[in-house]
From Swiss-Prot:
Entry coiled-coil feature ranges: none
This protein's record includes keyword Endoplasmic reticulum: no
Protein name, as recorded: Lon protease 1
Protein's organism: Desulfotalea psychrophila (strain LSv54 / DSM 12343)
InterPro entries per the UniProt record, alphabetical: AAA+_ATPase (IPR003593), ATPase_AAA_core (IPR003959), Lon_bac (IPR027543), Lon_bac/euk-typ (IPR004815), Lon_lid (IPR054594), Lon_proteolytic (IPR008269), Lon_Prtase (IPR027065), Lon_prtase_N (IPR003111)
One term of GO molecular function: ATP hydrolysis activity
Lineage: Bacteria, Pseudomonadati, Thermodesulfobacteriota, Desulfobulbia, Desulfobulbales
Protein's gene: lon1
Reaction catalysis annotation: Hydrolysis of proteins in presence of ATP
């Protein structure tokens, strides 16, 4: 019985010779009452048993080897250690860590000691004992013992019955589990089967029961009770063995059934092959690919590549790793829509109706698509076009792509370029890599099953570069009409014609798009919507869609135009309508929840309900100052969210010295514009002695409110100059005037961008008169009448023209 106890003994002498130690067999065995303790951590041992003990502790090794020359038997106490509440065993620290009953062991033979290896010796168990006193001599244990006096018992019929039951169970156990055969041989050899106590000990030791269960047998004095406990352990072991046999039989039966089915299937397959009723995998694959390419108009290069791969498959077996690689490559080659085109719609009237039904406004986009269809109707085909839709979020750039595809009668595929940093996403991976795939463009063509789909490249301004390459550079070939007729994907390695594909890209900003890529696209700006457009979109599209989404009839919840106006002005002032749709969705949810018990027959949303449904207003009412103030001028700005009003404030701090500073998170260009305005106004008022004295004696502070918002650009030049002029002269601006324009150092007013967005912001702020650069007059004239309505525009060439309009 192998044990690996941790032995605690006094320090011994140095290791003597490592010869085998054999104690005299005839020396009288005198059992000492004080013994060194060898802890057992797994199972106890029983009298009349022999087994190995392994000692790893160097001090105990020295102690044992030092006793071989004393010519006296060497005895130890073997005590089982208790387990902690988690069922774990640990090195004993006190007497409480041991059980109270153990056995005394006599050392029979010591194996030679190899340096660095544990010491192993054979022991014979002599007798049981009770622990009288356990003494810890740091860090070892000694025990004072009282040996059991084995009582002579009369073998009754009951004990005979127990003995017979144990022997029969052991025989059955050996039959079920041959591993117990050695234990049975030992039992027959060493034990008198007519001694119930010894039979109980050996049978308990044969089992795989836990240490505490076997210790219970060891510590039981009553032979009848002990043999009863041993029988329980044997029976438990027998049941476990039966369960193991049952499980093994079931598994073997399943395996045999699977093997039999496999062999039968293999035989059936071979028979079918001999009769010509089936084909091998290679032949089946070959026929599949040949049927696919039968109706395709393959270019010569693609046909040659397919023939090469088919020949490779003929030579490779299905078990070859290259077989699956070639099969995947052939799948892509043969499933591409070579020469397959969808029929285009040349009906201008039908296309216009689809575009108008799906989107309100967006006239520039609609006109460009109508022009494309008109040219196609004359030419007989629609050539590939690359459009770039730019504008703030939520104005319909992405959704308009599907409408354009429907109006043209083409398949539609969209994928986002946002965050893409790997060139292989566009041009594919080379086939040498594991898991290689074609790029997104080829995947889109295959998915659409058409060589002339509409592919939308969303968020093209958010592409990034990395060590894997620059996707924007890979797009140069895709989006160049002069090159994309021979587009080469790294995976396909065969040229594919993209010249018939209509590419539509979307972006919020143009600054992050490389100039070479931007030059290949035709730009169409989608400005923000004005109030009337937002209400029309909500009435025609957003409300019906959300009503359907929430399972409502149109008459159940009514949102009037004044309520929509209040929502737009107070909660959804962004350029697009995404925020407006979010507000409508929130109103419907809260209304359904609050009226669930009473029913939703006809609920009318009122302005006063908005605070409870949407919370407090996110935007204050935007309008110019009703009473003009010195140094405060209203400007117009263009942001990612559309147009907005921009107030410029100037303040003079009397310090006795001149100076100038700007605040409001201004960018470099805007800071330069303010310095130009400051220098020009000082020059302009150079002949005014009062103004000269004012600038010499005051520190000027120019501020642009909403200080947490970064601002940049040159278009606030004349606005800042007017603010400084107003402060220096003490004059106030004419009420209801807003302006935008770049100012040069010589007083010229230069053109600006975002005219439409700025005019929308002016109308929203109830501005009556706007001042624009003369060169933007044509931009203003091209605006729709509903934007120019109630706006009086004045066009200026110099700053002096501005002063004539603003200051009377």
């Amino acid at each position: 019985m192998a044990e690996e106890p941790t032995i605690l003994t006094p320090d011994g002498v140095e290791n003597p010779d490592h010869d085998d130690l054999q104690f005299p067999a005839r020396m009288e065995d005198i059992l000492p009452e004080m013994l060194m303790v060898i802890p057992l951590y797994e199972r106890p041992m029983f009298p009349k048993m022999m087994g190995p003990i392994i000692i790893e502790d160097m001090r105990l090794q020295k102690f044992i080897l030092s006793q071989k020359d004393k010519k006296v038997p060497l005895f130890f106490a073997l005590l089982l250690t208790r387990q902690d509440p988690d069922g774990q065993v640990k090195a004993p620290e006190s007497a409480d860590d041991f059980y109270d009953v153990g056995v005394v062991a006599k050392v029979i033979q010591i194996s030679p000691l190899t340096i660095g290896e544990p010491l192993q010796f054979i022991v014979e168990i002599k007798a049981r004992f009770d622990v009288v006193k356990l003494i810890k001599k740091e860090p070892l244990f000694q025990v004072e013992v009282k040996y059991w006096q084995e009582e002579k018992i009369k073998v009754t019929d009951e004990l005979k019955a127990y003995s017979t039951a144990i022997i029969d169970s052991i025989k059955e156990l050996v039959h079920l589990n041959p591993i117990f055969r050695e234990g049975l041989s030992l039992l027959i050899e060493r034990i008198n089967l007519h001694e119930p106590g010894s039979l109980a000990d050996f049978s308990a030791a044969m089992t795989t029961s836990s240490g505490p269960e076997i210790q219970k047998v060891l510590a039981t004095r009553s032979v009848r009770k002990r043999i009863e406990l041993a029988l329980v352990l044997i029976k438990k072991e027998l049941e476990i063995s039966k369960l193991k046999v049952k499980i093994s039989s079931r598994i073997e039966e399943q395996l045999s059934k699977q093997q039999r089915e496999f062999f039968l299937k293999q035989q059936l397959q071979e028979i079918k092959k001999e009769l010509g009723l089936t084909k091998d995998d290679t032949q089946t694959e070959m026929e599949k690919y040949e049927n696919r390419i039968k109706d395709l108009h393959l270019p010569e290069e693609a046909q040659e590549r397919i023939d090469e791969e088919l020949e490779k498959i003929r030579l490779l077996g299905p078990s070859s790793p290259e077989f699956n690689v070639s099969r995947t490559y052939l799948d892509w080659l043969t499933m591409m829509p070579w020469g397959v085109y969808t029929k285009d719609n040349y009906s201008v009237k039908k296309a216009r109706k689809i575009l108008d039904d799906d989107h309100h406004g967006l006239d520039d986009v609609k006109d460009r698509i109508i022009e494309l269809i008109s040219v196609g109707s004359i030419k007989g085909e629609l050539t590939g076009t690359i459009l770039l839709l730019t504008g703030p979020p939520g104005v319909g750039k992405t959704s308009v792509g599907q409408s354009i595809a429907r109006s043209l009668g083409r398949k539609f595929f969209r994928f986002s370029l946002g965050g893409m940093r790997d060139e292989a996403e566009i041009k594919g991976h080379r086939r040498t890599y594991i898991g290689a795939m074609p790029g997104k463009v080829i995947q889109a063509i295959k998915s659409c099953k058409s060589a002339n789909p509409l592919i939308m490249l969303d968020e093209i301004d958010k592409i990034g570069a990395s060590f894997r390459g620059d996707p924007a550079s890979a797009l140069l070939e895709v989006l160049d009409p002069e090159q994309n007729s021979d587009f080469l994907d790294h995976y396909l390695d065969v040229r594919f014609d993209l010249s018939k594909v209509l590419f539509i890209c979307t972006a919020n900003l143009l600054d992050t798009i490389p100039p070479a890529l931007l030059d290949r696209m035709e730009r169409i700006e989608l400005p923000g919507y004005i109030l009337a457009e937002k209400i029309a979109i909500a009435r025609k599209h957003l409300i019906p869609r959300q009503m359907k989404h929430h399972g409502l009839r149109p008459s159940q919840i009514i949102i009037s135009n004044p309520v929509l106006t209040a929502i737009v002005e107070g909660y959804a002032r962004e350029a697009g309508v995404r925020g407006l749709e979010t507000c409508i969705r929130k109103i419907l949810r809260k209304t359904i929840t609050s009226h669930l018990a009473g029913g939703l027959e006809k609920v009318r949303i009122r302005k006063r309900d908005l605070r409870g449904l949407l919370g407090r207003r996110l935007f204050a009412e935007e309008q110019v100052y009703s009473t003009p103030r010195v140094g405060v001028i209203t400007g117009l700005a263009y942001t990612n969210m559309g147009g907005t009003t921009l107030y410029i404030e100037s303040l003079a701090v009397p310090t006795g010295d001149s100076g100038f500073k700007q605040t409001g998170q201004l960018g470099k260009v805007m800071i330069e514009s303010s310095e130009i305005a400051y220098s020009y106004i000082r020059f302009l008022l150079g002949d005014d002695s009062a103004a000269v004295k004012f600038f010499n004696k005051n520190f000027i502070h120019l501020h642009v409110p909403a200080g947490a918002t970064p601002k940049d650009g040159p278009s606030a030049g004349i606005t800042m100059a007017c603010s400084l002029y107003s402060m220096a002269t003490g004059k106030t601006i004419v009420p209801g005037v807003a302006m935008t324009g770049e100012l040069t150092l010589t007083g010229l007013v230069m053109p600006i961008g975002g005219v439409k967005e700025k005019m929308i912001a002016a109308r929203r702020a109830h501005v009556k008169q706007v001042i624009l650069p003369k060169e933007n007059e044509e931009d203003f004239d091209m605006l729709p009448d509903y934007i120019k309505e109630d706006l009086s525009a004045k066009f200026v060439e110099t700053f002096e023209d501005v002063l004539k309009i603003c200051f009377k």
